[in-house]
Amino acid sequence: MRTVKEVKVKDYILDGKKIYIQSMLNKRSDDIEGSVDQAVELEKAGCDIVRAAIPNMEAIKLIPAIKDKVNIPLVADIHFDYKLALAAADAGVDKIRINPGNIGDIDRVKQVAVTCANKNIPIRIGVNSGSLEKHILERYQAPTAEALVESALYHVKLLEKFDFENIVISIKSSNVKTMIESYRLAALKCGYPMHLGVTEAGTERIGIIKSSVGIGSLLCDGIGETIRVSLTGDPIKEIYAAKDILKAVGTVSYTHLRAHETLSDL
């Protein structure tokens, strides 16, 4: 059985003993009321962790607004601007998702790591097949599992260089086989918790099929601490699909069963 390094996200412990369901808000970041309402509905549906895109400083207002209305952990999704990560941490977010390769030079990554360490905020390193570093892509000629894992582990080592080990990893691909191979390879090389998902999963039917195969296979291997079934449209359906996957592989907790619904109930 894989030994998982314990990471705490608000009140949750990611240690391999329980699987947590995650979803992402899809309202405009300037629609604070709509975003808050959606977060509330996701929590009611059984979502354990909710993620919100923070594309600009104005969107930082989302963080206290959402945290005031829901009890589940809130993740800030940050791209390109390290200052957004710093502001999100100051605003009280529970976890930050970044790709260290696209937020600037090493000094900026260090500032994010130091700030998050001081506030005990975990960082999810989010690597996906569509945003591999150019030099890695040139070496492998394609976003292979080996290329994706090399990128993820480089960023892990970068954070570790700054004495930051409060890390969660995601290595996503729209190709299900590549996604499975990537996580299996990464699981052999490091013990950090892993967030499972298939990027660009697509429409509801195709998205559920791809996510079920990818996420389900890895859960059966004992890999994965949080999961997200990425679907277009209403994110509530992501929760129902995730519950069905957990039930199918026999890892549903009482919490998930209590709120369980299937897509046929919609």
Predicted regions and their residues:
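Catalytic alpha/beta core domains of metabolic enzymes, predominantly
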Residues: 137-254
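Conserved anion-binding
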Residues: 104-162
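N-terminal small/glycine-rich loop or linker at the start of catalytic domains
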Residues: 8-27, 62-64, 124-140
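Active-site mouth loops of central-metabolism enzymes
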Residues: 19-33, 75-78, 138-147, 202-207
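Conserved small/polar residues in nucleotide/adenosyl-binding loops
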Residues: 255-262
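Glycine-rich, proline-tolerant flexible connector loops at the mouths of alpha/beta enzymes
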Residues: 45-65, 100-103, 170-173
